[in-house]
Structure formats: C-alpha cells, structure tokens
Amino acid sequence: MAKASSIRQFVTSRFIVPGTGLLKGFKLVEDSNSITHLFQVHARLITSGNFWDSSWAIRLLKSSSRFGDSSYTVSIYRSIGKLYCANPVFKAYLVSSSPKQALGFYFDILRFGFVPDSYTFVSLISCIEKTCCVDSGKMCHGQAIKHGCDQVLPVQNSLMHMYTCCGALDLAKKLFVEIPKRDIVSWNSIIAGMVRNGDVLAAHKLFDEMPDKNIISWNIMISAYLGANNPGVSISLFREMVRAGFQGNESTLVLLLNACGRSARLKEGRSVHASLIRTFLNSSVVIDTALIDMYGKCKEVGLARRIFDSLSIRNKVTWNVMILAHCLHGRPEGGLELFEAMINGMLRPDEVTFVGVLCGCARAGLVSQGQSYYSLMVDEFQIKPNFGHQWCMANLYSSAGFPEEAEEALKNLPDEDVTPESTKWANLLSSSRFTGNPTLGESIAKSLIETDPLNYKYYHLLMNIYSVTGRWEDVNRVREMVKERKIGRIPGCGLVDLKEIVHGLRLGCKEAEKVFTETSLEKCYSDSPS
C-alpha cells in the first residue's frame, strides 16, 4: 500500500525536483511491482518532460524488462534511440511468451551497428534455450565466437545448458571438456543435462568427480534418481549429503518427502516432518503439499487429512494429493466428498483430480457414480480422457463384474494415445487383469526385466500379474529378487500400483508421467496459492 501511495504521489506531482527528487523517482520505478504502475510513471515522465533525459529512459527500460511485455520494452528502446542499451530487451524476451523473437531482434539491431557483449549472449542464449531450437543455438554460438565472447565463462555455461535443453548432449559435453577453468555452474549444467537426456549413471559418475559441490548439485542427483523411479537411491544420496555437511533447502525436502512417499518409507518421512517442525518456523504450500502427499502414499490418510485441514493456503495440487490419498489409500467416500467441496469452492479440477475420483469409484464399487463423474469430466470441464482415465473406468467395470465393458473401456483409447506400446499393454492388461490369464503378461514382463534389469517397474508389473491370479508364492519370489538386486523397496501390490506402471510404460507421453508417476506434485513449484 505504501509503495502504491508513493507511486500516486509521484504521478500526480506537478513537477519533479532534480537531484533528490530524481533519485526518488528512479527508486519508485525500480521497485514497482506492477506494470500498471510502470505505465503511470512512464506517462508522468513524458508529461513532465523528464523522459527525454536518457538516464530516466534507461532506468524505465531496465524496469520494464521484468514484466514479460516484450513489445512495450522494445517500444521504450526504440524511443531512446541508443543502440548500446539493448540488453534489457533480451531479458524482456526471456520472461515473455515469445522468446523466439529475440534472435530476429538481435539481427535487426546488428545491421544498425549494435555491438553485443557477454551479457547480450547470456540472455539471448537463454531465450533460444526456451525454444529448444538447436539450429538457432548454433547460430548464436557462431555469433558469440565472431564477437569474441565465446571464451567468457557465463557464456560458455549458457551455451552448454542450451545445448542440453535442445537435446544436443554431445555438443554440450564437447564445450564442457574445452572449458579451461570450470566453475560449479559448469559442472551442475552438464550433470543436469545428462540427467535431462536420460543418462543418470554417467551423470552420477561425473557428480562423484566434482571438486566442489553445492546444494544444487545434490538436488540434481536426488531428483535424477527420483525421476528414474529409484527413490531408495534418492534417500541414500540425501543421507550422504548430510554426512558431507549440507543441510538441504526447501527443494531438497520436497524431493525427499516425494521419495519417502513413493517408496512407502513412513519412518523416514516422519523423521523429515519432525525436522521440519524443529527447523522451519514458516511453512509453505509446497512443503505442506509434499507432506500430505507423503503421508497419503504411506497410507496414513488420517495424518494427511489433519495437515490438509490445518492449512490456510491450498492450491490445486494440495487438493489433488488429498483427494488421491483418500481415493487410493483411504476411504474413497472421503475423497469424493472432498472433490465436491473443491468444485463448490469454484476451484477447477484437472485430469489428475479425475484420476483420483474415478479410482475412488472403482475401489468403492460405485459404477453409476463413476460414469457420472466421467461424463462431468468430459462434458462440463472439457477434459479429454487419456489412458489413465480409461484404465480407471476399466477397473470400475471389472470390480463390478462387467469384464466385457472393462475390456472395451481399456481398448477404447483416444487417438493420440494409440501407439504400438499402448495397444500392446492394453491387450496385455485385458488378458491378465480381466480374464485371469497371466501367461502373456508373465512372458512380456520377464522379457522386459531381461532388457532392463534395474527398472523396478517391470518387477512390479510381474508381481501384479501374479497377484491377480493368486500366485502369492511367485509374488514373494519376485520380492526377494528385488531385495537381492538392491533395486529399492516396492510398495504393496494393488490396483493403483499396476495402473501406475502400465501408464508409465506409454513411452514418450509427458501427460502420462504427470498423471500417474508423479501425481503432479512437482507442479507445486509453479502453481500459485488459491
């Protein structure tokens, strides 16, 4: 309020006193937290005649680059008419919805004599990184070489990160090797790039070779194994990190809680919670949501609900993880009641919400209610069904004694989900789950284990195939095999576990990973409280 009041006083003043008044104006512009305030200040500068003082204009230009309105920033830049102050424009493109326009702007001003520096290329490369266009990246790299900026470490780090984001890991590795004096950002960038491109073991090897590590380095590796479905290693890395003298930050704790939940390690999860109570006076929606998610996955739904009910701030992900906890691990009716409260509170559900709701209906045997929710999802909320929703409906019909409808639901996939992989798994699951014939499923699962013996999902799939036909000795045998190979603890067999595994096997489907494997917890980082 005080800041807005100062803006109003500045805007309505009849004149601006040079010296102290000018500095106060600079401060108001730089501290403005709203582009509307910036427009007001801009207008006042023009009407008072002070905008044409280049120092005012440049300060305004720098402030405008924070708001993501690149066209507004470009208009200020063009009105100044000075080529050398173009760098804020690249920053504006970076936070805007049109980063790909940055390269065109660069070549436009280059024709008029603009001389780029290392700051130019760091921002420009970051813009190209967001577009994932490796050809544009190479073009920018060539420009950095031409203007003598390619040996500047921040530029080299930016190029390396850009190449990994564009899938050109070999180019990134080549750059890394050629950097004579690497800093910790260089190491973190290449390790994160290896993880991003699926080479977790090589990333871990390089991580072990790092001369110095920071908390970001540890978070990268903890997250890497969590993303590779090996939460046990993530927890081991955290312990190693603590022994090395690092305390972790909010991101570390969210990753750790996620790992505890996904591996059903309630004891470790409680320990993290106790540590949070001892060390963090002010909680956050991210941490609170991670705690709810962890307790829910460890089947302590009552504890999860107590935390949920105590929160003053919740976002969509908070609601989703609580609904999922009830519907998958607790009393399904509690999740359905929470869903009704969610939509009555005018919070729009998403595809993850309906995964929980439909699974809850399957567990409770509520066929007509499940059909109604499915129709609500499609007709009212315009959410297109994916593999996950079809699988939930298949289990709903199967548990109610309608195997034909179950098979039909699973095979009736959306066009974009129909791939050789999804069709194969649909047929496999139909035969294994609904008709009680595990022979085909057993054969495929074993062949998958042979091709990737460290992927716990394949063992988990085999255990579920055995469990649906009551082959409990075989289930225990696979469990022992998992322990001997130290692949990591596997949660108990059940409807959700099988569903999660199958959905994750729909290769290349980012939507699938978001719906089941991660239960969308990672969205907490970007979702705002509601």
Swiss-Prot record:
Name of the protein: Pentatricopeptide repeat-containing protein At3g51320
Keywords, in A-Z order: Repeat
Signal peptide: none
Region feature (Type E motif): 424-499
Alphabetized InterPro entries for the sequence: E_motif, Pentatricopeptide_rpt, PPR_At4g14850-like_plant, TPR-like_helical_dom_sf
Keyword Repeat in record: yes
Family classification: Belongs to the PPR family. PCMP-E subfamily.
One GO process term, biological-process aspect: RNA modification
Entry keyword Phosphoprotein: no
PPR repeats (start-end): 82-116, 117-151, 152-182, 183-217, 218-248, 249-283, 284-314, 315-349, 350-380, 386-420
Gene3D superfamilies documented for this protein: Tetratricopeptide repeat domain (1.25.40.10)
PROSITE patterns hit by this protein: PPR
